[in-house]
Amino acid sequence: MLTRKQYELLRFINERLKESGIPPSFDEMKDALDLRSKSGIHRLITALEERGFIRRLANRARAIEVIKLPEPALGSGGRRGFTPSVIEGNLGKARGPASFDESGEQPVAVPVMGRIAAGTPIEALQTRSHTISVPPDMLGAGEHYALEVRGDSMVEAGILDGDMALIQRSENADTGDIVVALIDEEEATLKRFRRRGASIALEPANTAYEVRILPPNRVRIQGKLIGLYRKY
């Protein structure tokens, strides 16, 4: 599994390689991740190498090769080509009705309904706490809400602890969708949905967690993930 910082560093290295063909220096990595020392970068690099995401080439300065990326960057999720859109920026509360985003369109106020477990299921949350502003072209049709992600079971799908998950309200899902699943009317969790014969599989995107296989009468879909709102 990847921590938030490991994921951010891997993405930064990959983007720099795509742009220039040259890996970033340790100082550049340190600044990009807002770390105080290069020792933290050394630890992150070692962790990524041990997990098989990168490879350091011997006897060459700044020689790092990206071997693989988490699922969204590969576009290889259960629903082919599906990658949640990510808004990076300030997770402030919704602005007033006269506010507009950079494109000139009025943002949509999406209610935040609490927290959702990307790990061990937590109790279902029904309380609306506040709203966040989201670009309208990210939402599409239908009713939407947001949930703050807690846990790391979906990290290899690019969903990190602390992200705000943007959910399209729906009672149905296709195989490969990442959904908000209500289990036994008590526990809510964010997982990838698949049908396995007469059963439903709720799959994590982290090998440290197990797939849950449940009968349909124990699972109720409450929405599908359409995007992420991430604060840096």
From Swiss-Prot:
DNA-binding region (UniProt annotation): 26-46
Claim: Methyltransferase is one of the keywords in the record: no
Entry keywords, A to Z: Autocatalytic cleavage, DNA damage, DNA repair, DNA replication, DNA-binding, Hydrolase, Repressor, SOS response, Transcription, Transcription regulation
A GO term for molecular function: serine-type endopeptidase activity
One Pfam family of this chain: Peptidase_S24
Enzyme Commission designation: 3.4.21.88
Reaction(s) catalysed by this chain's protein: Hydrolysis of Ala-|-Gly bond in repressor LexA
Record keyword Iron present: no
Active-site residues from the entry: 153, 191
GO BP term, example: DNA repair
Family matches, as InterPro entries: LexA (IPR006200), LexA-like (IPR039418), LexA/Signal_pep-like_sf (IPR036286), LexA_DNA-bd_dom (IPR006199), LexA_repressor (IPR050077), Peptidase_S24_LexA (IPR006197), Peptidase_S24_S26A/B/C (IPR015927), WH-like_DNA-bd_sf (IPR036388)
Enzyme class: hydrolase
Subunit details: Homodimer.
Entry similarity comment: Belongs to the peptidase S24 family.
NCBIfam families: lexA
Record's function text: Represses a number of genes involved in the response to DNA damage (SOS response), including recA and lexA. In the presence of single-stranded DNA, RecA interacts with LexA causing an autocatalytic cleavage which disrupts the DNA-binding part of LexA, leading to derepression of the SOS regulon and eventually DNA repair.
Annotated protein name in UniProt: LexA repressor
Species this protein is from: Afipia carboxidovorans (strain ATCC 49405 / DSM 1227 / KCTC 32145 / OM5) (Oligotropha carboxidovorans)
Gene (name only): lexA
